[in-house]
């Protein structure tokens, strides 16, 4: 699969982009080169703290997961409390996520979930080719 290609660094010493015959294309939900919006802010803060070596779609996805759940918990309101059982919390979150809840974060905007838990969000097409090394 193409997981992680979004973090490909064509400037790494020893990386020979000419070994890519023409180009490699992949779909991703995160642009690790973004400088604008929520993703740009995430990238700036992340690289200030951890450096750019570990920046990838996986960290961005984890970040969005935490904040999507946080937002859904706020949306659930008093259906969730410190005394709620794990089962009750799960039921409340399933209700929120399955009833039109949307989240905008670093991996996309207006992210929605279906009633059976599948996520719906736009993917972006990226192309890595020899000209990227210049």
Predicted regions and their residues:
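Extracytosolic ligand-binding ectodomains
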Residues: 1-134
